[in-house]
Amino acid sequence: LSSQFGIDLSVRDAVDLDSVELPAPRIEPPAALAHRCSADRHERASHTQGKSYRDVVRASYGQLDDPPDLVARPRTEAEVVALLDWASDAGIAMVPYGGGSSVTGGVSCAVVGDFAGVVSMDLTGLDRVVEIDRTSRAARIQGGALGPVLEDQLRPHGLTLRHFPQSFEFSTLGGWLATRAGGHYASVYTHIDDLVESMRVVTPTGVSESRRLPGSGAGPSTDRLFLGSEGAFGVITEAWMRVQDRPVFKASAGVRFAAYDDAVDAVRAISQSALFPVNCRLLDPLEAAMSAGVDDGSALLVLGFESADHPVDAWIERAVELGRDHGGVVPDGIVKSGSATGNATSAPAGTAAGREGAVGAWRNSFVRAPYTRDALVRLSVIVETFETACTWDAFACLHANVIDAVTDAVNRVCGVGMVSCRFTHVYPDGPAPYFTVYAPGRPGSEVAQWDEIKAAASDALLANGGTITHHHSVGRDHDPWYRQQRSAPMGRALAAVKTELDPAGILNPGIIV
């Protein structure tokens, strides 16, 4: 990056938390809840905000101006009810908190409104897989279970939820549901919504629990009301989730394209072929170079298939054939595991398919990306992402205009920088483009610089037919553009729901409504 930017990048020391002054707590919990509440400075500091670029920058400077007064850690649903009753009666804002990985200000305690105080409700104490229905292949899981925690409990049963967002290690089932998180699957099961059988949600006015059903046409869906509500309507305490047998057969390939437009056409053909790959991520030449070590100017399509039931040879071979039909080449071949290899390369024993070559390099980079970003903050490098979805007919214009608008903003604000794009998920009717910005920041001004770039990006997304977010959620950061995207009647309807379920307005104030 130093070479690309033509400047020296020097490491800035992070501020020691012990030197940061936090305002004194304004509230005390009732005696019955005191054992679940803490005013410890490290607890309060770590629950002040999430993990967006601006959050990480502010934390590195010790700018924790709006910590919660208390952090509550309920261990039972009854304690969640008691906390909401207390908050409603005392006029205290209650911010539901899972793993704290929000990148849109969704767990920020800088709430707007006249509240006696703010409590961050950390739900990671509700972390059990309570029940497994092997016949229906479903599991009842508490909302505070972190990704690795729930998978560890499913694994002995030969099952998996198979939902792996980039925040997997530091995010919870309840957080995924509340933000409609995108996960492992690049097609079909792209969002956590698709894996929900039923949900149980505690609201300030009562408990809402939907019936366990494989499908229903009985009016508007209760689950759909709470999915994506981001803690504004209630606290998700548990859910029945559709789980799967652990995959045995896997195959992957990296298809390179000299022309990016040809790569896009290939992805569209694959997405409309009913092959339904679990991985179908297209990296533009810059992203391929930065994340996969592709140094010949090619775009890279990362393909993957998996199954617990049958070999996936025919599926990966047809997808690769479609790539070749559009000018793609496969220098590392097709890598398979758990199946007859045919003319493909077999993955070494004990390894998963797709962990070598450019595909393996991309995978490793994907896993490391959040940690790399946080380290770059100390170099005052602006490195952040934004994402969207659009129809195929709109993509070419959206891609060109967004790249132009963001590049102009980066050059204006930072003097120099880069913007890359990849597809994270694909649908028969359109892709989900995901953009990454790299630029040198001015120490002390990084947040203001990013805010200006982010505004230009968000304006361009909506102006060119995209959504303000495909899977990052609305939070506080996207709220102005979300209000433009949704209709006025829907805004009024959501406000009415908020009034009915949370009449005191204490749940995550300023979110969604």
PLM-predicted stretches and their roles:
Residues 69-71, 113-118, 138, 381-389, ...:
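Glycine-rich tight-turn/loop motif centered on a GG-T
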Residues 127-281, 346-348, 506:
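FAD-binding subdomain of flavoenzyme oxidoreductases
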Residues 1-32, 83:
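Flexible inter-domain linker/hinge segments
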Residues 27-28, 38-124, 161:
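Glycine-rich N-terminal segment of FAD-binding domains in flavoprotein oxidoreductases
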Residues 475-513:
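Activity-critical C-terminal alpha-helical subdomain
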Residues 19, 25-61, 245, 251-259, ...:
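C-terminal substrate-recognition/cap domain of FAD-linked oxidoreductases
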